[in-house]
From Swiss-Prot:
<comment type="subunit">
    <text>The core complex is formed by different alpha and beta chains, binding bacteriochlorophyll molecules, and arranged most probably in tetrameric structures disposed around the reaction center. The non-pigmented gamma chains may constitute additional components.</text>
</comment>
<feature type="topological domain" description="Cytoplasmic">
    <location>
        <begin position="1"/>
        <end position="20"/>
    </location>
</feature>
<dbReference type="GO" id="GO:0045156">
    <property type="term" value="F:electron transporter, transferring electrons within the cyclic electron transport pathway of photosynthesis activity"/>
</dbReference>
<keyword id="KW-0812">Transmembrane</keyword>
<keyword id="KW-0157">Chromophore</keyword>
<dbReference type="GO" id="GO:0042314">
    <property type="term" value="F:bacteriochlorophyll binding"/>
</dbReference>
<keyword id="KW-1133">Transmembrane helix</keyword>
<keyword id="KW-0148">Chlorophyll</keyword>
<keyword id="KW-0472">Membrane</keyword>
<dbReference type="InterPro" id="IPR035889">
    <property type="entry name" value="Light-harvesting_complex"/>
</dbReference>
<protein>
    <recommendedName>
        <fullName>Light-harvesting protein B-800-850 beta chain</fullName>
    </recommendedName>
</protein>
<keyword id="KW-0460">Magnesium</keyword>
<keyword id="KW-1003">Cell membrane</keyword>
<feature type="binding site" description="axial binding residue">
    <location>
        <position position="19"/>
    </location>
    <ligand>
        <name>a bacteriochlorophyll</name>
    </ligand>
</feature>
<feature type="transmembrane region" description="Helical">
    <location>
        <begin position="21"/>
        <end position="43"/>
    </location>
</feature>
<dbReference type="Pfam" id="PF00556">
    <property type="entry name" value="LHC"/>
</dbReference>
<feature type="topological domain" description="Periplasmic">
    <location>
        <begin position="44"/>
        <end position="48"/>
    </location>
</feature>
Length: 48
């Protein structure tokens, strides 16, 4: 029952694994974006 493929052609287990990678990538992107905004705030006239 667990090897039933959905619309994407992935099994439930494969989808969950892929989702973990997507979430990890989003978190990394978020951290980099926050860091970039802090630098932009510190080194530019933005909001000063």
């Amino acid at each position: 029952a667990d090897d039933v493929k959905g619309l994407t052609g992935l099994t439930a287990a494969e989808s969950e694994e892929l989702h973990k990678h997507v979430i990890d990538g989003t978190r990394v992107f978020f951290v980099i974006a926050i860091f970039a905004h802090v630098l932009a705030f510190a080194f530019s006239p933005w909001l000063h």
